[in-house]
Amino acid sequence: VTSITLDLVNPTAGQYSSFVDKIRNNVKDPNLKYGGTDIAVIGPPSKEKFLRINFQSSRGTVSLGLKRDNLYVVAYLAMDNTNVNRAYYFRSEITSAELTALFPEATTANQKALEYTEDYQSIEKNAQITQGDKSRKELGLGIDLLLTSMEAVNKKARVVKNEARFLLIAIQMTAEAARFRYIQNLVIKNFPNKFNSENKVIQFEVNWKKISTAIYGDAKNGVFNKDYDFGFGKVRQVKDLQMGLLMYLGKPK
């Protein structure tokens, strides 16, 4: 299993950027190009199913497991308050045997299936966000926030609310930043500070499949055949979307 590590002890914007690029480069197929663009495209499913992301702080490491064929989150690994490694996983996304290969530090006895599902709505419900529209948007983004949310699950007894908040922030700072340079650039622009998220970020996240499909099936030389609106105004030039990574949709048309 490939591991990609982000050092949160003294991170720089450059380190974060190259961390996101590494995720993108690990899952892309260099030979795939959609819509006459040079945007990276995820490769077809392969034998290596998962990617391991490590967040390192001065207090230890918390790891995230992502599916290589779509960057969906499958599991995370953290030490509890007695310094025992525990792996928590989404049952529909990964088996116990696969989890052992991904996070060998946790014994089978210390694997636990999460009581909720891997979609944003389910994680948000467990994050108990009370302000605004009660979605992940209210939590914000940023390196400092990633560190504080990680420390809330690092060497602590499990608290579902803290776990869900960590997952919401970590998914966006890894998978979503790899998919959308727009999000990666916001993190860098505000580095390392926490910043308020915005509707455009959420619109990107919920439209990844739609955007990928439009570029795959309805763009030539980087231009859409018609105007598209993905929730933040009309777009005709693919480059205006600042995409980082497209969903695998088969051989180019």
Swiss-Prot record:
It comes from the Eukaryota. It catalyses: Endohydrolysis of the N-glycosidic bond at one specific adenosine on the 28S rRNA. GO terms for molecular function: rRNA N-glycosylase activity; toxin activity. Keywords: Hydrolase, Plant defense, Protein synthesis inhibitor, Toxin. Its EC number is 3.2.2.22. Pfam families: RIP. One of its GO terms (biological process) is negative regulation of translation. The active site is at residue 176. Ribosome-inactivating protein of type 1, inhibits protein synthesis in animal cells. Belongs to the ribosome-inactivating protein family. Type 1 RIP subfamily. This is Ribosome-inactivating protein saporin-7.
